[in-house]
Swiss-Prot record:
GO terms for molecular function: endopeptidase activity; heparin binding; metalloendopeptidase activity; zinc ion binding. Residues 1015-1054 form the PLAC domain. Its main location: secreted. Found in cartilage and skin. Its cofactor is Zn(2+). Binds 1 zinc ion per subunit. This is A disintegrin and metalloproteinase with thrombospondin motifs 3. Residues 256-460 form the Peptidase M12B domain. It is found in: Secreted; Secreted, Extracellular space, Extracellular matrix. Residues 1174-1205 are annotated as: Disordered.
Length: 1205
């Protein structure tokens, strides 16, 4: 690279005069030839910084200056945008930081050489006498904040590699050419505000002799005669490489990292200048990295700088032997191996060394030298490159390709045809290349060797750095945290000590120690707060080094809360907390969301329609001031869809739009154009007209969900009137439900159109005192578009209208006719009673065949054919529908055209990542992956082709996994039949452990009790009481004690009457007697449960809730696994209810068909039956009350149901 500003002064030669004593730090006189003719085509440009849309921001370009510039208002600091206009083209560059170019901890070393006269020979060049000592003069971190990569906006297949350390410098690869850009003068960062001139030139325009890369020296291992003496020195390293694989950290199957030591000799440093050479080298390596990211390579390789060494003068000339490339490469490789860090995990341990020089180490035209397949070798992984500007990046990429195993294209392979198109591994690098790419042979040769280069599998960006303390405040005092929060000089406030220092961090400055400030946050956990104590969760407590980290886990979901709206579709939520357990001591938070929602109250509101968004705006009328004034706020729909769930309102007085600084309420419609999608916590949720979340179902023109317009009618007409006096004059009405309403004047008129809500009397348009002007507004829950053009008014809304409206005119002149035409669409059931000539049926949807797509090309390249594919299209909205809607006999014949006429490149097998294993253990687990045959195209993209075009065996797409024995588990057999036919018995089953005594968990039970109907062998000998014939007591036959006493009467009634205890339960909680005081005195006694299968509409009652039915004083209670007091039959009855829904209900005083009055004596006599029985079970839907000594039956009619057993 040269100082191009000197070229413009037409200086043919520049003399750099220095003293010439040949020692370190002293340089001989050098003449540097700077012919302006070297660049046949170049342009001077002034790049600008822009935003994403390409709008000008500033002339600031450099990273160092951008930090100080107040005009840099880029919305995303992770992206930069620049505009460059050159060669008649606009390049809108979109850049992001190349965070993978410089490894963490990378350094730049400046070496210094001292030669001491003597008889000791140089260890590298035997023929030079003297003793050399080399020391590191200084070390500094390698700059990492100004390397960027990206592309050109809206141009596919482009790439950009640029640094902005000092202006813009790097490579721009467009769709048909490669360009280099660099500043005209260096070191002018602080003068960029006025614009900085850069030079842009084409790579193809660099005038130089074709570089014959066929002469570059790439030797095999047998050629390393000069390095035999290193076998012993590096034997241990080689063995270590074979025995110890470097850690493979997050490296994907096609993700490799070449960690580079960049050696730079003194000739390069002097040419570019010590203050600029680092920026230049960073740019150069950024370009090399981008070349290896080209998709044509087929493997993703990162070129990562871990160390850069700048050599002194004496060491530089000792390594390079003029005219002897093999000896020069041998010296460079030996030197690089001596720089290697012995620790494989050292951040500066390199995989490959790249050496740059401007010295002539070979014949004219030779640019680089490298061994083939030397990557990862302790000595052979190195290249020697002649540096000659940014185009040298291709030389470096070429030579590194040899080390990776690539041969020259056309030499020993069949890719000679690609050299003319600019392949990176072409033996002759021609100046006319327009676009570089990697040939198919380079990709194949790389894949042949890449898997053997284990050193490329580790990730330099994921080293095992020293473990950080679990508590972040351990390393920072309160004074330091104050300095971080408020700036230099601030310390912990000591003006008052009455507070716990861990509650809030208060800070003050020594200049005003009694003025304390806080950011309302506590100090970091781990901050020392007293001797032997630290802050933890806002408290100062004794230090405990054994605090265990605990990850969080979700607790159970709450019940769904109340609905956000009473009608018109609302939302209700349920939540869960991360407290089972909570994350503590640095543990992971719970994954996933802490809330769920569902739609509720989706029915339409029955009363007068109210706009939910309008209500929220109207609530701000009394207290929200805008520009120190209160307003009447109307709803406003923001044009940005992302902001429509934020509450924006429009002033009725001024038309100003104000943000109310809050989200709209859940359930508010996102848009007035979509009556179903709603806002949920600030996000628009898609809802179909079927009121299902995520549904795509839509209404037809008259509001039928999923309809086809068959029920739609169009109403239209013209109404003409001539006003005789001033004041509003009614023209006509438009009914509710109207959609796609259009009202317009037929001719220019001085009168003004007005619209009034018939239901409320509120003027929607042009009320009293309003100025008539074109506008879009929202009213009646819909959006209206009012337009005045050439004194002709028109009004349109998509509707639907929720209330009827009246169309009026405001006369401005008497005796001037006004003629209005109206048109709207409405459902046939809502058509108003008017002249039938004004009502026409809406046209049904019509369909036509339309070009849908083209078939896949018959050939992936080399010229094939494809045919048209036709689909059925609806004419009304041009949407594609199922082909059955179109007539098959009218389908057009397919049209043929040629395709893929580009020259063929060889398709390759590409395998994606393996999916998760289907099993965690056992013998049947497997995992799958997608394997495709992809053809690289000339535009840098890939195309999927048929597998027959890919050579070689198809990679496996299924493989076994997790084929390990599963932990032993208990196996259980089926339960046997009950051991008895009635009463209590037992059931048994077989329980086995297939692994002896090594099964996990507690052994399942093998015996359990079973309960069958009670045994009853007593014959019925007739009724034993006169009460058995009373109809009022007939329903007590379900009670075993009563049935036994009245067996004859009960058996007769069972065939004609439904069982009285099976009457359906009450439909409201008020109809269920839950207090024993409500029962007849004769029925108050311990009560068991009756199986009950009917459900109330309100909810089901589970066994776990039964214990609370009777209230705290109830006589009956049920708790699982508990034994109530009483006879065995009560216990068996509860067991029979095991898995059924049961209900405590009361016994009614009379059957549903009669009202019977029982005397107290009769009730007492009836109670004698139950005193002898073990339990009672009853059902009722009645609620009784006692008034004036009489029992009043308030029961409602009931339905009978059956009992399932």
């Amino acid at each position: 690279m040269v100082l191009l500003s000197l070229w413009l002064i037409a200086a043919a030669l520049v003399e750099v005069r220095t003293s010439a004593d040949g020692q370190a730090g002293n340089e001989e006189m050098v003449q540097i030839d700077l012919p302006i003719k070297r660049y046949r085509e170049y342009e001077l440009v002034t790049p600008v910084s822009t935003n994403l849309e390409g709008r000008y921001l500033s002339h600031t370009l450099s990273a160092s200056h951008k930090k100080r510039s107040a005009r840099d208002v880029s919305s995303n600091p992770e992206q930069l945008f620049f505009n460059i206009t050159a060669f008649g083209k606009d390049f809108h560059l979109r850049l992001k930081p190349n965070t993978q170019l410089v490894a963490p901890g990378a350094v730049v070393e400046w070496h210094e050489t001292s030669l001491v006269p003597g008889n000791i020979t140089d260890p590298i060049n035997n023929h030079q006498p003297g003793s050399a000592t080399y020391r590191i003069r200084r070390t500094e971190p390698l700059q990492t904040n100004c390397a960027y990569v990206g592309d050109i906006v809206d141009i596919p297949g482009t790439s950009v590699a640029i640094s902005n350390c000092d202006g813009l410098a790097g490579m721009i690869k467009s769709d048909n050419e490669e360009y280099f850009i660099e500043p005209l003068e260096r070191g002018k960062q602080m003068e960029e505000e006025k614009g900085r001139i850069h030079v842009v030139y084409k790579r193809s325009a660099v005038e130089q002799a074709p570089i014959d890369m066929s002469k570059d020296f790439h030797y095999r291992e047998s050629d390393l005669e000069g390095l035999d003496d290193l076998g012993t020195v590096y034997g241990n390293i080689h063995q270590q490489l074979n025995e110890t694989m470097r850690r493979r950290r997050h490296a994907g199957e096609n993700d490799y990292n070449i960690e580079v030591l960049l050696g730079v000799d003194d000739s390069v440093v002097r040419f570019h200048g010590k203050e600029h050479v680092q920026n230049y080298l960073l740019t150069l390596m950024n370009i090399v990295n981008e070349i290896y990211h080209d998709e044509s390579l087929g493997v993703h390789i990162n070129v990562v700088l871990v160390r850069m060494i700048m050599l002194g003068y004496a060491k530089s000339i000792s390594l390079i032997e003029r005219g002897n490339p093999s000896r020069s490469l041998e010296n460079v490789c030996r030197w690089a191996s001596q720089q290697q860090r012995s620790d494989l995990n050292h951040s500066e341990h390199h995989d490959h060394a790249i050496f740059l020089t401007r010295q002539d180490f070979g014949p004219a035209g030779m640019q680089g030298y490298a061994p083939v397949t030397g990557m990862c070798h302790p000595v052979r992984s190195c290249t020697l490159n002649h540096e000659d500007g940014f185009s040298s990046a291709f030389v470096v990429a070429h030579e590194t390709g040899h080390v990776l195993g690539m041969e020259h294209d056309g030499q020993g392979n069949r890719c000679g045809d690609e050299t003319a198109m600019g392949s990176v591994m072409a033996p002759l690098v021609q100046a006319a290349f327009h676009r570089y790419h990697w040939s198919r042979c380079s990709g194949q040769e790389l894949k042949r060797y890449i898997h053997s280069y284990d050193c490329l599998l580790d990730d330099p960006f994921d080293h095992d750095w020293p473990k950080l303390p679990e508590l972040p405040g351990i390393n920072y005092s309160m004074d330091e945290q104050c300095r971080f929060d408020f700036g230099v000089g601030y310390k912990m406030c000591t003006a008052f000590r009455t507070f716990d220092p861990c509650k809030q961090l208060w800070c003050s400055h020594p200049d005003n120690p009694y003025f304390c400030k806080t950011k309302k946050g506590p100090p970091l956990d781990g901050t020392e707060c007293a001797a032997g104590k630290w802050c933890y969760k806002g408290h100062c407590m004794w230090k405990n080094a054994n605090q265990q980290k605990q990850d969080g886990n979700w607790g159970s979901w709450t019940k769904f809360g109340s609905c956000s709206r009473t009608c018109g579709t609302g939302v209700r939520f349920r939540t869960r907390q991360c407290n089972n357990p909570m994350p503590i001591n640095g543990g992971q938070d719970c994954p996933g969301v802490n809330f769920e929602y569902q739609l509720c109250n989706t029915e339409e509101c029955q009363k007068h329609f109210e706009d939910f968004r309008a209500q929220q705006c109207q609530q701000r009328n009394s207290h929200f001031e805008y520009q120190n004034t209160k307003h009447h706020w109307l709803p406003y729909e923001h044009p940005d869809p992302k902001k429509r769930c934020h509450l924006y309102c429009q002033s009725k007085e001024t038309g100003d739009v104000a943000y109310m600084k809050q989200l709209v309420h859940d359930g508010t419609h996102c848009s007035y154009k979509d009556p179903y999608s709603i806002c949920v916590r600030g996000e628009c949720v898609k809802v179909g007209c079927d009121k299902e979340i995520g549904s795509n179902k839509v209404e037809d023109k008259c509001g039928v969900c999923g309809g086809d317009n068959s029920h739609c009618r169009t109403v239209k007409g013209t109404f003409t009137r001539t006003p005789r006096k001033l004041g509003y004059l009614k023209m006509f009405d438009i009914p509710p439900g109207a959609r796609h309403v259009l009202i317009q004047e037929d001719e220019a008129s001085p009168h003004i159109l007005a619209i009034k809500n018939q239901a409320t009397g509120h003027y929607i348009l042009n009320g009293k005192g309003e100025e008539a002007k074109s506008r879009t507004f929202i009213d009646l829950g819909v959006e209206w578009d009012y337009n005045i053009e050439d004194d002709i008014e028109s009004l349109h809304t998509d509707g639907p209208l929720h209330d009827p409206v009246i169309v009026l005119i405001i006369p401005q002149e008497n005796d001037t006719r006004s003629s209005l035409t109206y048109k709207y669409i409405i459902h046939e059931d809502s058509v108003p009673t008017i002249n039938s000539n004004n009502v026409i049926q809406e046209e049904l949807d019509t369909f036509e065949w339309a070009l849908k797509s083209w078939s896949q090309c018959s050939k992936p390249c080399g010229g094939g054919f494809q045919y048209t594919k036709y689909g059925c299209r609806r004419k009304s909205d041009n949407k594609m529908v199922h082909r059955s809607f179109c007539e098959a006999n009218k389908k057009p014949k397919p049209i043929r055209r040629m395709c893929n006429i580009q020259e063929c490149t060889h398709p390759l097998w590409v395998a994606e990542e393996w999916e998760h294993c289907t099993k965690t253990c056992g013998s049947s687990g497997y995992q799958l992956r997608t394997v495709r045959c992809l053809q690289p195209l000339l535009d840098g993209t890939n195309r999927s082709v048929h597998s027959k075009y890919c050579m070689g065996d198809r990679p496996e797409s299924r493989r076994p996994c997790n084929r390990v024995p599963c932990p032993a588990q208990w196996k259980t057999g089926p339960w046997s039949e009950c051991s008895v036919t009635c009463g209590e018995g037992t059931e048994v089953r077989q329980v086995l452990c297939r692994a002896g005594d090594h099964c996990d968990g507690e052994k399942p039970e093998s015996v359990r009790a079973c309960q069958l109907p009670p045994c009853n062998d007593e014959p019925c000998l007739g009724d034993k009481s006169i009460f058995c014939q009373m109809e009022v007591l007939a329903r007590y036959c379900s009670i075993p004690g009563y049935n036994k006493l009245c067996c004859e009467s009960c058996s007769k009634r069972s065939s004609t009457l439904p069982p009285p205890y099976l009457l359906e339960a009450a439909e409201t909680h008020d109809d269920v007697i839950s207090n024993p005081s409500d029962l007849p005195r004769s029925l108050v006694m311990p009560t068991s449960l009756v199986p009950y299968h009917s459900e109330t509409p309100a909810k089901k009652m589970s066994l776990s809730s039964i214990s609370s039915v009777g209230g705290p004083n109830a006589y009956a209670a049920f708790r699982p696994n508990s034994k109530p007091d009483g006879a065995n039959l009560r216990q068996r009855s509860a067991q029979q209810a095991g898995s059924k829904t049961v209900r405590l209900v009361t016994v009614p005083s009379s059957p549903p068909t009669k009202r019977v009055h029982l005397s107290s004596a009769s009730q007492m006599a009836a109670a004698s039956f139950f005193a002898a029985s073990d339990s009672i079970g009853a059902s009722s839907q009645a609620r009784t009350s006692k008034k004036d000594g009489k029992i009043i039956d308030n029961r409602r009619p009931t339905r009978s149901s059956t009992l399932e057993r």
